Amino acid sequence: MIDRLEKIQEKYLRISEELNQAKDPSSLKNLYKERSRLTPLYLKVEEYLKIYKDRKDAEELIQSEKDEEMHSMLKEEIREANLKLETLEREFEILLLPPDPNSGKNILVEIRAGTGGEEAGLFVADLFRMYSKFADKQKIKTEIIDSSPTGIGGLKEIIFALEDDRAYDLFKFEGGTHRVQRIPSTESGGRIHTSAVTVAVLPEADEEEVQINESDLRIDVYRSSGAGGQHVNTTDSAVRITHIPTGVVVACQDEKSQHKNKAKALRILSARILEKQAEDKKQASDAIKKQMIGSGDRSERVRTYNFPQGRCTDHRIGFTSHNLSAIMEGDLDELIGALTEEDRVRKISETQTH
């Protein structure tokens, strides 16, 4: 344990030294990110090593101490040190877990209507509102990238960006199928309808992670259309980009400017290519899947929102809240906290069995 902690200490100090000498912006960014990730661990290591040294000194002194009062004080000092070291060792179980490679990234969140017709479209809008309110409470910037309104206040699809180094860690468990059970306002018989929407959480790609060559793209432009299919723009401002090597297709029509739509489409394209690369890696490694709370796949049913009963259930961890109204207002802290804790427990268990 001590050897491992001293190596972490050395690594942190080496990165700090490299930061003082680095001039390349890309290197500086990576070094700052790595040091920021290591800082909480480094501070705990410093604390642990100091207590460990103090305990060792006390153990040496107690061997030759003849005074009863002093002997008793040293014994108590050793006991307290042992308790502190045990607490820190439990914290290290979490801090020493391998970092998620996507932690610290900005993300794109994509919500699409699934089964359920107009009700599904309305719930897409409800989920976007829920996520926006949660992001606002966390002081995270939200930017709509593209959306397709239904004309009755719903959305066929919406893609939005969340820009903050906490965004991925807070939203990474949202991917999958979200099911809603409620009585539509148009339902005169009071029957409960079930509909579903899918959520995808896409980490934004760094330039070095996804390099897109212009020659690999087919770019089509067309007139954007609004709810019901009517054309809302008389110029060809909407953009569809096909990445020929992967077959990934992205369309964007939210902006009136073709240039802005192209820039947004390229942003989505980069994230989707990164997602495809991650999926390919997942298929090659079952071990990664076992470490996750669910797969994050669009087809996996992750949560049910039952409005008549005021209940929200996350099926992956058996979490149930009977305060659905608060959740829909963006009060997601308890739910996300439970998912994060369960993920930590599973990862710790996984490391202990290897």
UniProtKB/Swiss-Prot annotation:
Q: Which SUPFAM superfamilies match?
A: Release factor
Gene Ontology cellular-component terms for this entry are: cytoplasm
> What's the main place this protein lives?
cytoplasm
Q: Which GO terms describe its molecular function?
A: translation release factor activity, codon specific
How is the protein modified post-translationally, according to the record?
Methylated by PrmC. Methylation increases the termination efficiency of RF1.
Q: Which UniProt keywords apply?
A: Cytoplasm, Methylation, Protein biosynthesis
Q: Which domain of life is it from?
A: Bacteria
Q: Where in the cell is it found?
A: Cytoplasm
Indicate yes or no for the key word Cytoplasm. Answer: yes
Modified residue N5-methylglutamine is at which positions?
A: Q230
Spell out the InterPro entries in the cross-references: PCRF, Pep_chain_release_fac_I, Pep_chain_release_fac_I_sf, Prokaryotic/Mito_RF, RF-1
In the record, the note on similarity to other proteins reads: Belongs to the prokaryotic/mitochondrial release factor family.
Q: What does this protein do?
A: Peptide chain release factor 1 directs the termination of translation in response to the peptide chain termination codons UAG and UAA.
Official protein name in the record:
Peptide chain release factor 1
Native species of this protein?
Leptospira interrogans serogroup Icterohaemorrhagiae serovar Lai (strain 56601)
